Amino acid sequence: HELKISYKLIMSYLRHLCEKEAFKTLESSLPYKHLIDGVGLDSSEKGNPPSKFINVFKESANHGYKLVAHAGEEGPVDYIWEALNLLKVVRIDHGNRCLDDEYLVQKLLEKKIGLTLCPLSNLELKVIQRMEHHPVLEMLQKGILATIHSDDPAYFGGYMNENYYETAKALNLNEEHLMQLAINAFELSWLRPKVKEKHISQVKSYFNSLK
């Protein structure tokens, strides 16, 4: 409150471990359920498909947790489909590979499923070779609810400002693109509708003041 920053917590299962370990994490979280808004799936994606965790995600939903998962960053586009169809996630974390499948793009648009992209992390992990190759601009042009995030700033060289700045510089993003990215972030958030509207209105007012 002192810094006027609000937050919601997402607990993550580590995909390089087995589902049994994820169930242990779930059980450990239950006494603190009132503090946790959702569960996710992260760590090494290659060789660890979302389908490994169907049962624990189903049980997590039974406990009222919202569901998200890392998919389609280092792993194939099939992992995005698995996260959507098998884990029933409401958002895809990363999701860079979605553009490989036009039918998937249509699904994301129809269901208003957004992506949390981490450009500097993608560069550091060699998901992209250059920032100019990042897919976020094409995603925005297709109407996908793309957003920009920092992943693990201490490891990957940048907090939110650096990610926005380097992406905008590399892709020549204009003010409309930047405004849409900020609006998308609030649209995808788990804030109450009136709070979302308030923040989105502030974003629009700021960008309008620049004209």
Regions inferred by a protein language model and the residue ranges of each:
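Active-site beta-loop-alpha junctions enriched in small/polar residues
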Residues: I10-H16, D42-K46, G72-E74, G95-R97, ...
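Short acidic/glycine-rich loop or secondary-structure boundary segments that cap or lie
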Residues: P76-D78, T116, L123-K126, F156
